[in-house]
Amino acid sequence: SNDDIVIEGLTRLGYDREDAHNYVVAACWEFIIPGRGMDIPNIDALSFVKAVEDATLDGLENCSSYDEFEALVNENISRQADEICRNTENVHMFPAPFLSLMMEGCVENARDISLGCRYNNYGIHGTGISTAVDSMAAIKKYVFDTEMIDKRILVDALSKNFEGYKAIQMVLRDDAPKFGNNDDYADDIAISLLETFARSLEGRRNDRGGIFRPGTGSAMYYIWHS
């Protein structure tokens, strides 16, 4: 991990700088503070792909510009965020007395870790970012910028899983800009999606007084979000 980025990021999220310097990686890639946090860094996940898919199938034909289409995607992201935050209310945690012995403040306050600690933040994963970006980049380029593909034809092709639309499928798959190739055309879309995701969780508090941390990762959601 990159300390220069991680420490500043954790500090902006409200972690004390001393604690931010002491972060560890929890299992996969999420950041937690050992001994001082009851954070759940992957309590649920938001699907970027679902946000793009719904915007495409339900609204693309009515969009006169890419900005209008992007606004639909952003609305879907915010809607998912609302639902996820509601679903995390009143989550029951089983008591963990042995773990509590090792957490700051639990013994002193006669309080089990399941009831909270210094940090009680929930992390929401954003899944499928590369697929979502690739899809939006293809739509931006071929539907709006070059107008090479009619939006109604694209929606019909998607509804038929490209059966009868092989040529369009090959263009979208092989020629469209792709995320992760140092191509600003696609990468700027990724930045926009992530910023929208972050804004959708900004200022929210869970029922333990913690914040909702946005993050990325598709592990274990390959099937659930497919």
Indicate residue ranges for each PLM-predicted region:
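Conserved catalytic cores of very large enzyme subunits
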Residues: S1-S226
